[in-house]
Amino acid sequence: MSRVAKKPISIPKGVEVSVQSDMLTVKGVKGVLTFPKSDNVNVVMDGDILTLSANDPSHISLAGTVRAILSNMIKGVSIGFERKLELVGVGYRASMQGKDLNLTLGFSHPLVFVPPEGITLLTPSQTEVVVQGIDKQRVGEVAAKIRSFRPPEPYKGKGLKYAAEAIIRKEAKKA
């Protein structure tokens, strides 16, 4: 069996998990998340412990994937997820206009990004953007979408980068 799927999930206080025949629902302080349940994976709830197992040896990897997704759902509705982005470059700025993100990235026009449902954007400073939400996948997708407007270039390092990202720099061409 998958090492990931073998590890049981403990449910923290304030989080409710309901297992139906075709759907897994996780309710918490921050919101509600649902995930379609596969018939090939058994989910057993014993008090505040969830255990997963595969029906067939060929579905062991699926059990590990479902366990990781379920664990992230529980963490999301209790704590939440966030991704931080930094703007590096002269004149690169970020500001909030209501719920929309206004980006000045050296183009002839400012970029306006409207966040999808369930995602909160914050700008603690003009050179920082924080993406928050309860769904880990959507937070990552939105952060990647914002970063794609001006990814960091390797010569000067200008652009939008993740806070912990290390940009591999290239040396300029010598004459």
Swiss-Prot record:
This protein's UniProt keywords: Ribonucleoprotein, Ribosomal protein, RNA-binding, rRNA-binding
GO CC annotations on file: cytosolic large ribosomal subunit
Gene3D superfamilies found in the cross-reference section: Ribosomal protein L6, alpha-beta domain (3.90.930.12)
Listed InterPro entries: Ribosomal_uL6-like, Ribosomal_uL6-like_a/b-dom_sf, Ribosomal_uL6_a/b-dom, Ribosomal_uL6_bac-type, Ribosomal_uL6_CS
UniProt-listed PROSITE patterns: RIBOSOMAL_L6_1
GO biological process terms on file: cytoplasmic translation
GO molecular function: rRNA binding; structural constituent of ribosome
Family to which the UniProt record says this protein belongs: Belongs to the universal ribosomal protein uL6 family.
PANTHER family in UniProt: 60S/50S RIBOSOMAL PROTEIN L6/L9, LARGE RIBOSOMAL SUBUNIT PROTEIN UL6M
Function: This protein binds to the 23S rRNA, and is important in its secondary structure. It is located near the subunit interface in the base of the L7/L12 stalk, and near the tRNA binding site of the peptidyltransferase center.
Subunit structure: Part of the 50S ribosomal subunit.
UniProt-recorded name of the protein: Large ribosomal subunit protein uL6
